[in-house]
Each structure stands twice: as structure tokens, then as C-alpha cells.
């Protein structure tokens, strides 16, 4: 977990507590689909704030539950990109 993005993927995939935020693991398949959709939405030269917003948009596009979307938000808060 050498970087913000790597830590975020780890938290979403496996779950853990970081910076006082507890994130539930969603598994590799769900996170892979989430990031695939996120990348499809990305503008040229995105930043971490964009990543936060796009992850939430992608989660909604994929029909994730409100609990799953809240989990994505919590993971973003944990790595401080919210």
C-alpha cells in the first residue's frame, strides 16, 4: 500500500480500519467492476478529488446499494480524498 490509490483499492477489496474509518471488503470482482466503470468516466488529467466523485458515480451506475456506496465514501474518507 505504497500510495493513496493502492491503499484505497486495498480497503475496498479486503476491508480494514484506517485513519479511524472502518471499510468493509467488497471483494476483487466488485472492486474491479467499480474501477472499470470509474476509468470509463474519467476526464483527461483527473486528480484525487475527481477519483472520489467518479467512484461514487460509478457505484451508482453499477446499481450498488446505498450501503455499498456509503462504504465507497468511507474508503475515500479513510485515504482523505473526499
What are these regions (language model features)?
Residues 1-82:
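Extracellular low-complexity, Gly/Ser/Thr-rich intrinsically disordered linkers
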Amino acid at each position: 500500500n505504497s500510495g493513496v490509490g493502492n491503499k484505497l483499492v486495498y480497503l475496498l477489496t479486503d476491508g480494514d480500519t484506517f485513519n479511524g474509518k472502518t471499510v468493509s471488503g467488497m471483494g476483487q470482482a466488485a472492486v474491479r467492476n467499480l474501477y472499470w466503470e470509474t476509468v470509463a468516466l474519467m476526464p483527461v488529467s483527473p486528480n484525487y478529488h475527481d477519483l472520489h466523485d467518479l467512484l461514487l458515480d460509478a457505484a451508482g451506475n453499477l446499481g450498488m446499494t446505498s450501503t455499498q456506496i456509503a462504504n465507497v465514501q468511507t474508503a475515500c474518507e479513510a485515504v482523505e480524498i473526499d
